[in-house]
Amino acid sequence: MPAPRPRLQQIARVLAQRVDSWVNTLTGVGTATGKTNVAFVPNQNELLSLVDCENLYNFDGVAARICDAVPVNALRGGFTVSTGDAEVESAIHAALDALNATERATRAWTWGRLYGGGALYLGIDDGLPPEEPVDEARIRALRWMVDVDRRDLYPMTWETDDASPRFGQPDTYRLTRMGGTASETVTVHHTRIVRFEGVTPTRRRRLLLQGWGESVLQRAYMEMQAMRGAFAAAGVLIQEASQGVLKIKDLMDLMAADTDDVIRRRLSLMDESRSVARSLLLDADGESYERVETGALTGVADIMDRMVLLLSATTGIPVTILMGKSPAGLNATGESDIRAWYDTIAADREKMLRSRLERVVRLALISREGPTGGREPSGWKVQFPSLWQSTPSEEADLRAKVATTDAMYIDKGVLTPEEVALSRFRKEGWSAETTVDLDARRAAQEADAAAAAQHAGG
């Protein structure tokens, strides 16, 4: 009967070769007996549920910062809509403020990163029920917009036409809106939804996620565990780094004589004298007290910094942003890292924000009660402010340079004083962007040419 053992050993070797992890059978790393095997072999039990994600966001500051960092930084200065007409731009800005567009978009993007899916539900007044596609020709107004997450938005029907560019995507959703003690469930067409996702999953994984993305916390979860464990262990080491030792003559004889109460009273008296008199009262002949260093903490800070760097590498967020300051002893973060981070944010603005915000803005523009009365300006576009924040000195220097340029343009006839005034001093504040109404310019030129021709003919 012992014959099958070689067969079992062969199977074990094959399984060891196929395990999706780093394995060292000599040290035990990655094996069932290794101390770090959990950190190397992710399995189905380690997948974060939506409840896990919510708890991490609510009760773990680092997890919340991972989810918040990109949306908050990308939209901290809001966004503007450029049309070439300062008055129209101010009206659009006021309409978007009334919708609370910047805050709603920030939340929806945050929920997308936290849960793998978030969305804006648009209150489009076109006279149709929400389960019907939006009829752009009938839009009276964009009444409101609310942010929801994937738990509130469940795909009901899917696009099954393989010739459609939306093949395999949700066509309608079941939306559950929670409010107070009641909830409301409605069916909503995808044209009334603006989706935000987290990490892009594989095609098969997306099917399991019901068409949504993956939480950004999923990939960083093991690193977060390791970092939290390291900080907790460091706290224990600090508490145990120095231990007080009290030597009492004939202690073993006292214990053998069943005088525990005497020993307890002595220790209590020692603590009281240390707290009240800030000194120790000892028997000069039979007692002594000293503090003993139980271990050095050299190198602990470096190890903890490396764990923070690993979490930073996993999330793509610089340590300066993730932890609020650079790790001690490391030159891993600085201005170059912040610049690279801002470049990443700028790319995310283009990838995640621009098309979604442009859709919201366009629906507001073509609505009959919107800021432009239903007339969509030609050539309008969404613009984002610089991520770099100027100091007061830099701001004053910029304004001085812009004023010099404006004076030159006015002197040469390139701009009019009215155009400069409307461009610089807007309702939302000072702006370095210059807007010129080219249509008005052409109309004025044509009128001047017609007047000149009439004068010459007369």
Regions found by a protein language model. Name each.
Residues 101-121, 255-258, 263-267, 293-399, ...:
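C-terminal amphipathic alpha-helical
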Residues 1-75:
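N-terminal-proximal low-complexity accessory segments that begin disordered
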Residues 51-209, 371:
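Structured, mid-chain assembly/scaffold modules that mediate subunit interfaces
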Residues 190-333, 337, 389-393:
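Extended, charged amphipathic alpha-helical segments
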